[in-house]
């Protein structure tokens, strides 16, 4: 569910609280190329840990997916809790394509914990960009292997919101599938 995010060293809570969130792209049904800060989360560091629970199921009941158009990988997005309502930065069910991973992903989970996730890095973003947190799996892999994969995929990279169905894919979970990373298109 709500994923625990470790604050990046050097950032203070005060600077996070004062930072303005990025202007989030709006799904239109037409492909939109954009840059995003992409991170990964796994079975091992999900909230609660060692589970596959997700907060906003759309295509899956639990975190997972094979990265195809018809079975995209679960992805988390920042969110806000306002007057007790959980508001995602981008609507659940929004589809993305990540060219560096050659995976389709779908918003089905939230990134950020606590009573005010809007004060955390997932909602605030990174370098003025939206923060996308893809589920790298790890159920069948050692924690060190999934952590290494998460570290390898972390960074600013191109993504496509509302992609078409004919993108090149590497089928399988991110970690267990080899954690392949391709050059930017």
Regions found by a protein language model. Name each.
Residues 1-22:
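Fungal secretory targeting signals
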Residues 24-185:
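Solvent-exposed, well-ordered loop and adjacent helix/strand elements within mature globular domains
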């Amino acid at each position: 569910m709500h994923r625990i995010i470790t604050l990046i060293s050097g950032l203070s809570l005060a600077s996070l609280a004062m930072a303005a969130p990025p202007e989030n792209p709006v799904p239109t049904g037409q492909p939109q190329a954009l840059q995003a800060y992409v991170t990964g989360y796994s079975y091992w560091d999900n909230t609660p840990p060692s589970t596959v629970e997700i907060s906003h199921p759309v295509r899956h009941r639990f975190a997972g997916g094979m990265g195809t158009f018809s079975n995209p990988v679960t992805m988390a997005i920042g969110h806000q809790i306002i007057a007790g309502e959980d508001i995602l930065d981008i609507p659940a069910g929004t589809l993305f394509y990540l060219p560096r991973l050659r995976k389709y992903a779908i918003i089905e989970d939230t990134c950020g914990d606590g009573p005010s996730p809007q004060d955390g890095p997932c909602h605030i973003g990174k370098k003025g960009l939206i923060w996308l947190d893809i589920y790298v799996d790890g159920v069948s892999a050692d924690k060190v292997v999934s952590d290494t994969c998460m570290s390898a995929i972390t960074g600013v990279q191109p993504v496509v919101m509302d992609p078409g169905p004919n993108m090149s894919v590497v089928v399988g979970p991110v970690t267990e599938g080899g954690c392949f990373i391709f050059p930017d298109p």
